[in-house]
Each structure stands twice: as structure tokens, then as C-alpha cells.
Regions:
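N-terminal secretory signal peptides and thylakoid transit peptides that target proteins
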Residues: 2-20
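Alpha-helix boundary/capping and short turn/kink residues
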Residues: 19, 93, 108, 172-173
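Sec/Tat signal peptide C-region and signal peptidase I cleavage site
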Residues: 26-32
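Early exported N-terminus immediately downstream of N-terminal targeting peptides
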Residues: 35-114
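Solvent-exposed loop/turn segments at secondary-structure junctions
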Residues: 105-106, 143, 169-173
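Surface-exposed, charged secondary-structure patches
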Residues: 109-149
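Short beta-strand edge/turn micro-motifs at domain boundaries
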Residues: 148-173
């Protein structure tokens, strides 16, 4: 009986050691997202947006720049899936890819045209905090002749890289 117990203990030890070795040998996910990383990413995005606004470029050039910024910092596939709603689950990969590309262009044109409103204004990051499984980065937009308004960016690394997946403007998604 003593032999069976000690053999079982050795087996458990060996199994535990093997599992532990495998766990450490597997590629580990990059360290968890932090408030500083989320805030820093939005600071960079806002800096690039402010540079485009202040560039004096033609609207078409600004729209092209905005699309590059959007693709660089936004989780465009996640946002497109959300915009498509339940139909996204039924769409093929090719359909989702085509929709995502069209959605990316649409958002870039629609909101890129609004850059004119920001000329002479700015967006400033003021705070960041953890929420559920993501971070909220809070900023304030200041436009000429208008009261400052609140912008909240939801940031996550679930897609494999640091991206924003939602913007709330004055409480509206």
C-alpha cells in the first residue's frame, strides 16, 4: 500500500512538473494592458489627428490621412462587425472583409470631412481608467466658438494589438 501511495505521488509530481514546463514553454501573451499604455496610444492618435487638422492640407488629403490614422489606431474589424450587427455572424469571411474595407472608407470620408470644424481647435487627453476588460481614455475637444465637449475612447488589446474599439462623444456611441 505504501508503494502505491508513493508511486501515485511521484506520478502526480511528474505530471505537474510536465504541465508546468509546458505552460512556461508556451508563448506568453504580452504583459496585460495598462492605463499608461492605453492613454499613451490615444495621446499618439490625438497628436496625429491634431497634426492633420493643423496641416492646412486640402480636405481630400486630410481624409486620406484620417483613414491611415483610423486603420493604425482603431480595431476596424471589431467596429465594422458591431456596426453590421447580427448579420455579421451570417456573413462569409470574404463578405466581412469587403464590408470592413467599405466601412473603413465610409467612416474616413464621413468623419474626415468634419476636420474643417476642428481647424483652430484641439483634442486633449485628460484622464484614463480601467473599465471591465478594457480601458477608457477621456479627452476634451475644444472647437472654435463652441463649448468644449467630452470624448471617451475605449481601448483594448484583445485583437492582439493595442487599439480603440469605441468612441463616445458627449455620451453618444
Amino acid at each position: 500500500m505504501l508503494n502505491d501511495t508513493s508511486a501515485l505521488s511521484r506520478r502526480r509530481f511528474a505530471a505537474g512538473l510536465a504541465l508546468g514546463t509546458i505552460a512556461f514553454a508556451m508563448p506568453m501573451r504580452v504583459a496585460a494592458l495598462t492605463v499608461e499604455q492605453a492613454r499613451g496610444m490615444i495621446d499618439k492618435a490625438v497628436g496625429e489627428i491634431n497634426a492633420v487638422i493643423g496641416s492646412g492640407k486640402a480636405e481630400s488629403a486630410m481624409i486620406g490621412d484620417f483613414e491611415k490614422i483610423f486603420v493604425k489606431y482603431a480595431d476596424v474589424p471589431a467596429i465594422a462587425r458591431s456596426a453590421l450587427g447580427p448579420a455579421a455572424k451570417q456573413a462569409s469571411k470574404a463578405q466581412m472583409s469587403a464590408f470592413t474595407k467599405a466601412f473603413q472608407g465610409y467612416i474616413s470620408r464621413k468623419y474626415g470631412r468634419r476636420f474643417r470644424e476642428f481647424i483652430g481647435g484641439s483634442v486633449e487627453v485628460t484622464d484614463a481608467k480601467p473599465l471591465k476588460s478594457y480601458y477608457e481614455v477621456i479627452s476634451v475637444a475644444k472647437l472654435k466658438g463652441e463649448a468644449p465637449f467630452d470624448l471617451r475612447w475605449h481601448v483594448s488589446d484583445k485583437s492582439g494589438s493595442l487599439k480603440f474599439f469605441n468612441i463616445i462623444i458627449e455620451g453618444v456611441n
